[in-house]
């Protein structure tokens, strides 16, 4: 076994250990349990959320933002549950919790983490917009998938900062993709690391697959449409400058990933996708409420 293969296997074990230690807050687990119980009522869910005032406040903050665009104020958690519905609440609670995970480190780590989340929020908002535009059910799931797609970068920069920084420098110096630099440094890339983490967390298969294959969507099997949506959203965000590591031209659109989609009766094309940039930018701006939550800590 060569050095990089050995490093990859050791890295996977370490990521699995990190996932065990990075458990979601107890309230979030309770919320998920209530939502997944077919006997649960809206009152049951509202009761669990209301028991965590900080989470409840953030849910109301997002529910009353331009992100959802409801015409009247949602003043209570009970009303938020009724108006948003269980599926949207599940995605929202999970997203809010993710934004508050992983902290500390050096100033440059914190700066990079902020850029990471800004890119991820933008990608989530873009994926949600594309899901609505292209007729996919449950656009909130697309937002979560977009938010999570690069979580491998977050983990690598949090726990192996010097190696991660070395990968950034290597990509710049050798003019190679960041994934290539990661593989030379770690023996694995961020998509693999994120996928291992998602599997260890027992996330739904379609979310784990989206993380694994957001750069290689044709490899997806569980939910190829979701993976393709996030792939497209990621490309758009990089093209528009919503980029986590400042290398916007290194990503390549997998054109075959567009084939399952149509818009206004016509098959989706690269020109059509890139022509949505103005609309996508508006949706990204509406998602700034998540940046406020991130900055509030």
Predicted regions and their residues:
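Conserved alpha-helical "signature site"
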Residues: 1-255, 294-297
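Terminal targeting/low-complexity segments that flank the catalytic cores of oxidoreductases
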Residues: 1-4, 269-297
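All-alpha prenyltransferase/terpene-synthase fold signal
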Residues: 99, 262-265, 282
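Short, surface-exposed acidic
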Residues: 139, 205-207, 264-276
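Generic low-complexity, intrinsically disordered sequence content enriched
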Residues: 240, 257, 262, 277-280
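A hydrophobic, small-residue-rich beta->alpha segment in the mid-to-C-terminal subdomain
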Residues: 245, 255-266
